[in-house]
Amino acid sequence: MIDLTKLQNIVDSTNINLKELDVLNFLKNRKRWPLRYPWGQPSVEILSNAGDTQSNYLFDADSYLNFNKWEELYNLGYTSIVSNILDLTDDLRILQKKLFNKTGLNISGNFYFSKPGQQASFDAHKHSYDVIVKQIYGESTWSINNKSFLLQSQKSCIVPKNSVHQVLDKNVKKLSLTINIE
């Protein structure tokens, strides 16, 4: 059985210093962001105010991200989900290696990247797997199983599988790293 507290300690002890400009620069590398990865997962999505994700209109005819289209929505305050990101920096690669060594699982990670203006998160939902969230910068108010708390910069939380959760607000620019343990 996987000890989530030990994994959270690994996440907490791994320094990940990223700023908004870093993520913007990652997204300008358009060939890194296909419409879908070979396994079918979208690389970049926008969370709509209807509570679902949209991605097709963010991509050019060659199926790679159009940064300008994406940036327009980001600047309006829409949350972006940037998937499969644990290879982007040395710190993220180190974190992935540490988590793999502890679990034997190919751990995946996503960024939730946003600024104030639109819906903060998916409506309350749950996953069939555990998630560890690290707030890289900014802060947001979370609810996990009807308990609300403020997740601050460089802090983390565990979202146990089948827990009803959501981000309730985002009043500042924020970058969250979600680590899916599945």
Features from the language model and the residues they span:
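N-terminal auxiliary "cap/dimerization" subdomain that precedes the catalytic jelly-roll/cupin core
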Residues: 1-79
